Amino acid sequence: MRVLGFGDNIVDRFVDRGIDYPGGNSVNVAVYARRLGLEAAYLGVFGDDDLGRFLGESIAAQGVAVDRCAVRAGETGVSVLRVDDGDRVFLGWNGGGVTVREPLVLDDGLLEYVSSFDLAHSSVYSRSESELPKLAGLDTLVSFDLSSEEEFRTPSYLDRVCPHADLVLLSCSHLDGAATRALLAEVVRRGARLALATRGVDGAIAYDGRVTVETPARRVADPREIIDTMGCGDAFLTGFAVALLRGGWSAHTPPRRHLIERALREGAETAYGQCLVEGAFGCGRPTGQPAVASMWRASEREK
């Protein structure tokens, strides 16, 4: 089985540690799938700067293929964070750099490449929405991370993504159970075949239009063991999707309740393990430079 991460890559800069880590939603899913024993590749755009080379080399070192990626003139995306009591705190970013500004367009050759994978994953940070309809004629399953921001919950945005997605992930730790279930129902009504909501310590909920399945979070016995929560949602999605694939999920075979239940448990276990990992998948190096001046701070943005 083969999993493709299509879209975003970014450097996660932890200012409290002075360390840069490779990351990005699409990258992380590919790396985690590889660590779970599947073949994996990443398809996207790297900047032609030192950080872009750092990302490409770090991803390849995980056994994830990057040979079909593009390298373009421009800066690499940088996200600035710190850790407070094990939780990541997002401070700002530079807009994603050339990866977001000039996203990859799927031509016939790349579509043939994508068709060789069982699952292709993308996200709101990938600027891949316009490419999703091109995947409709393939037997490749499509998963998409809808994140947590309200701008990605509007009817117009959901209608761009959901009809083309076999699985969507929603981060819902800020919502109660009723609001989470209502959101899951909406994305399925708008075309997603299966919707997964992760709710942090409150576990996760999956809905396919027929059945609703829930699972508790896998708790860390000693919170002091938690290194940071970077990549935990991506890890949950990957563990969930890999379990579905191994259970027979395909473009022509939707998962039944018992398989969804098992996949939720696998997702929770994978997310638990991710809490004990530094950054998204390690591979950190000293930053050597401060956060760039163009980055906004969340507290200022909300004013």
Region spans (language model):
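Histidine-anchored nucleotide/phosphate-binding helix
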Residues: 26-35
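Extreme N-terminal starter segment of soluble prokaryotic enzymes
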Residues: 1-4
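Short, acidic/turn-prone active-site loops that include or flank metal/cofactor-
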Residues: 24-27, 95-98, 146-151, 173-175, ...
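A short, aliphatic-rich alpha-helical micro-motif
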Residues: 113-115, 162, 189
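Active-site metal-binding loops of divalent metal-dependent hydrolases
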Residues: 8-9, 235
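Conserved beta-alpha-beta core of the PfkB/ribokinase-like small-molecule kinase fold
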Residues: 119-186, 201-203
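Conserved phosphate-binding/catalytic region of the ribokinase-like
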Residues: 181-303
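Conserved N-terminal subdomain of the carbohydrate kinase-like
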Residues: 11-16, 20, 38-119, 138, ...
